[in-house]
């Protein structure tokens, strides 16, 4: 078994000298205009690799993690079918709630991308739903705190139902103006529907909404 490579940075390269590395010497707007060479000096390269590149491209798994991932791929078609069925049922329920402002899920006929989803994903779309709850950030926090089955997690596609508040988690580094530009309001919630019985998931979502 071979590794995919290792980053070793001595910290001795001058990224500013030639003017050929603007990614290090110019502001990074995704992190409030930070200039890596100015803020981190000799650690500019390794910090950028950690903060930006890993964020954009994902982490690098160990050999054992890759082995486990490969095992999981063997049952992926079966799991995806259930993910999609559960998510569709939850999305349809959310769409009928008077406490929800909007629901984004390509499996819904009302979604702007439904036709494309039917064309390219005829066997099901995905297990991730985003919806905006009335009352903004305070209501979103109350809803998430009231969930009993779902877990607050940053990842998706778990066998467990997971929920996340993007504005205070994955996109917390953005300003209010940037959040608006990205279509992320304070009431937006991301729900990754799991493989629990759909009735249990629906019951949990309903009781949490009732407590908002």
Q: Which residues fall in each region the model found?
A:
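Active-site C-terminal subdomain of aminotransferase-like
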Residues: 1-128, 132-162, 167
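PLP-dependent enzyme catalytic core of the Aspartate aminotransferase-like
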Residues: 79, 145, 161-212
């Amino acid at each position: 078994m071979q590794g995919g490579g290792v980053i070793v940075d001595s910290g001795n390269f001058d990224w500013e000298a030639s003017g050929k590395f603007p990614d290090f010497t110019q502001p990074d707007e995704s992190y409030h205009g930070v200039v890596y060479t100015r803020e981190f000096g000799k650690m500019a390269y390794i910090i950028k690799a950690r903060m930006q590149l890993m964020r954009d491209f994902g982490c690098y798994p160990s050999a054992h993690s890759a082995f486990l991932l490969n095992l999981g791929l063997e049952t992926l078609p079966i799991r995806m079918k259930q993910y999609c069925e559960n998510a569709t049922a939850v999305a349809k329920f959310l769409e009928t709630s008077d406490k929800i402002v909007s629901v984004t899920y390509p499996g819904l006929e009302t979604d702007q991308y439904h036709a494309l989803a039917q064309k390219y994903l005829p066997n099901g779309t995905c297990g991730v739903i985003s919806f905006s709850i009335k009352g903004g950030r305070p209501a979103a926090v109350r809803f998430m705190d009231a969930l009993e089955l779902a877990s607050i997690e940053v990842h998706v596609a778990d066998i467990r139902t997971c929920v996340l508040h993007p504005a205070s988690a994955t996109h917390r580094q953005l300003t209010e103006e940037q959040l608006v530009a990205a279509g992320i309001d304070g009431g937006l919630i991301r729900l990754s529907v799991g493989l629990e019985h759909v009735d249990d998931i629906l019951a949990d979502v309903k009781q949490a909404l009732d407590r908002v």
